[in-house]
Structure formats: structure tokens, C-alpha cells
Amino acid sequence: MTVGSLTHIIMLICTAGLITLGCVVIRKIPKVWQTVMIIAAVLVCCSCIFFRYGMGLSWEKGINLKPLLMQQLQVCNFNFILLPLALIPKFKLPKQYAFYFSMFAASTTLFALSSDWKPLEWYDTYVLNSWVSHSFAIASPLWMWSAGWIKPHRKYILPVSGCVFGYFTIVYIICEIMKGAGLMPLEQSFSFIYKTDGIPIFDTFHKWIPVPYWHLYLAFPILVGFFFLLSSFFNRSVSFITSGADKMLKVYGVIGDEITLLHGGDSNEGYYLSAWKKLDDEGNEEILYAPGETIKIGKKNIVLHAVWKPISADEAESVTSECSEEGAFVDA
């Protein structure tokens, strides 16, 4: 299986379709099933990593934790620890790390492919295991984002970047210790510390700074720029439209940085809207606009005539569900 082959392209298309379908479906189902779907994605990814490195891709060899622990020094296999941490509700940094960096790292593997795959068919256990684990390392944070678990704000860009290079630093220190103790051969490498694995950008970095580990710091400004673009894309402003015979405007979507229109309708005097609200870092709700203020929805300037009683996220979810059944709900 080689890069750009028909099999490779078909697998990429099928994987992208599955992940996209999951993003659509997870928005439409109740929260409990969203949680089940995300946990299942994390379990699939972690199970593939465990089966490959903890069991040697065989049910007969038994469990050997040493290779599994060693492979936590590899960027993509670190998802075995990272993604379960991202399931903890108030633990935001692992979610941001998974969304900004791990998802990107896993996607590069699917596009570039490992040189080990060349003599293998697509249905080989080694290929399928690696493909599925990397696919769900992408799907897990994307589905978390679609379900509202992750909001990739720019304030997390520098902390995540620091964690990325903190991870590489820890890997480098451990590798140096193992090399000094004769526990790791010189030709072995984790996370591009010593070897570039033929990847052009790392080859270039190593030519500019031919020193193990330190050449990776040339990637820092590139990562920060990429994270900024990623944040801008997933936090872009949303334009709304009205639908339904009664001209009801009923929207539940993200505007810019976690601002949410919970419920709205139409009156003879103009749009009759509820509170525009957001959650602060402690989870407290804050009303952003008061009656009489003008806001812009699409190309229309709308005056808020009233703010209805504050409603919780669960109540808002039930409202949008009812609107959807009426056919007047606009999914943002």
C-alpha cells in the first residue's frame, strides 16, 4: 500500500466520510448518546494501540506492557493516555491538546503513510490496526467539538504549544537516559528526536540545525500559526436564516467565542429574542445583550425587544428539539 494509490485514496475518502457523518449525527442525538459515541471512539483508538503494542497484534502472545509503555514516547501512541484524560469533563487542556496537536499528527500519518506499509496489502492486520487507531484519534476530538465538549479558543494556543514541546523534551531526556544505559539502540527513534523518517520538513529542519531534538524547535512558529488558523476556522462567526411559515427564528449555535442564542421568535414589532449568553471558565452563565441593544444576524440589524427568563443548556436543548420537530429550527 503506497501513498497516492487507488486503495489509499479510497481509504482516505471512506475515513473522511465516516468522521464527517459522525460530526453530523452527534449534533442530533441526546447528550447521553453523545457521551456514549465519544467514549466508544476513544475506546476503539486505545484498544487498537493496546492490541498492537501490548499484545503484539496476536491473541496468543499474551499481554506485555513494556512495549506499550515504551510507545508512549511516540506522538500518536500517546493518545493511549491522552484521550482517556480528555474524557474528564473539567479537564480542558488534554481536550485542547488532542484537538490542536494530536488530531493533526494522526492525520499526517494517514496522508503520508509509514514506509513499513509499502509491501503490505490494505487488509493486513498491521495496516488496518494502525489505520483505525489513527482515524479514531482524529474522530475523537472532532466529535467532542461537534458535541460542544471542546471550544478551541486562541487562549489555549500557547499552553498547548508549550505542552507539545514539553512532551518532546521529556521524550528526549528519557531516550538519552536509555541510550546511555544501553537500553535503546542508536538507530531507534521516538517522535523524530533522532531520525526524521524521511519526512521532508523534518529533513529540512535537521539540515538547518543538525542536532537531535533541537531541530524540532524550528517547528514552533509553524505550529503556533497552524493552531491560530485552526482556531479561526472552528470559531468562525455563524450567519443565521429564518425558516417556517411563522417566520420563527430558532437557533442554537456558536457565534464567535462560545456565545449562544438560546431561543427566539418573531412579533409584529420585530424579532423577539431570548438572552444571548456565554459560559465563563467557571461554567457560570453571563447575559451579553440586554433589551434594546442592536445585534447583527447575517446582513440584518436586529433590535432586542425583550430578554426572556434565563434558561439552562438542558432547557435550551429541549427547546431546539421541539423546534426541530416543528420544522422551524435552523441548525447553525
Language model feature labels by segment:
Residues 43-53, 102-114, 164-173:
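Aromatic-anchored segments of alpha-helical transmembrane domains
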Residues 9-17, 72-82, 98, 128-139:
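Membrane-embedded alpha-helical segments of multi-pass membrane proteins
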Residues 25-37, 88-96, 147-158:
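Membrane-interface helix-boundary motifs at transmembrane edges
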Residues 85-147:
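Membrane-proximal helix-loop-helix units in multi-pass membrane proteins
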Residues 18-24, 82-83, 136-155, 168:
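Alpha-helical transmembrane segments in multipass membrane proteins, preferentially the mid-helix core
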Residues 51-61, 111-122, 177:
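Juxtamembrane "helix-exit" motif on the non-cytosolic side of transmembrane helices
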Residues 238-332:
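Secondary-structure capping and domain/repeat boundary segments
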Residues 1-13, 157-162, 166, 182-228:
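Membrane-interface transmembrane-helix boundary segments in multi-pass integral membrane proteins
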